[in-house]
Amino acid sequence: PELNCDEFANIEPRLATPPQLFHEYTVGWSKLCLDKPEIYDFVATVLGEMAEITTGDYLHIGGDEIEDERYKEFVVKADSIVRGLGKTTIGWEEVTQAQVDSTLISQRWNGKTNSVVNTPIIESICSSFYYDHANIPGQEMTNNWCKEDGVSLKDAYTFKVKNPNTIGVEAPVWTEMVLSNEAADDRFWPRTIAMAEVGWSEDENKDYKNFIKRLGEHGLRLDLMDVHYFRTPEVEWNSDRNKGVFSEYMPESRW
């Protein structure tokens, strides 16, 4: 579970700056007021409750898209709170600008942070793994701020792990434009299959043409499982469903 510290901080308006309750989609402007000592009591309480109700070993403190002169101090304290609960901290890559503990796991989304501490890494580079982005150029109801033409199946599969500290990969899907289970399937599949093969394969053992050939053999299986996957045009699917559930959102020239 992730507690978004501290950019997405409107969950408690009294501790946020500015105090207006925000209910739209834009990000990058709200933050916890780090001058207030009560902030740490609040964060400790919420993280403590999260630790009690979850069985996993990790708590995610967020920490991206914020600029504050006390940011590094806050991140170090938040990391300490998580470790005090017997959990391992995960944070977006910006948290490694601070002298956090070396056990913290950095989740990279753009790879541009100048880290001052050597930590394990989860690769979630947006140009390969942000699956709220379009499957192909022009797909409606998708984001494109990281990669204008979308994050293709090939973008996902051809990602190369270059850092020896990498312990895994993860593909986030933000759901402000995912309004149904079918839409979620469209975002996840088949790109998640490509991501899985990235996670368990050495780069030299990957071959995209071979992958899409093997992938096509699972079309009928996915249909029978009622998975509303995006029917990537370059894959020769072995099923009769000619179009994906969201084909109406795709340029006709792509088919």
Language-model features, listed with the residues they occupy:
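Flexible, acidic glycine-rich loops studded with aromatic residues
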Residues: Q99-L104, W109-W255
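Aromatic-lined carbohydrate-binding surfaces of glycoside hydrolases
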Residues: P1-I81, V95-V100
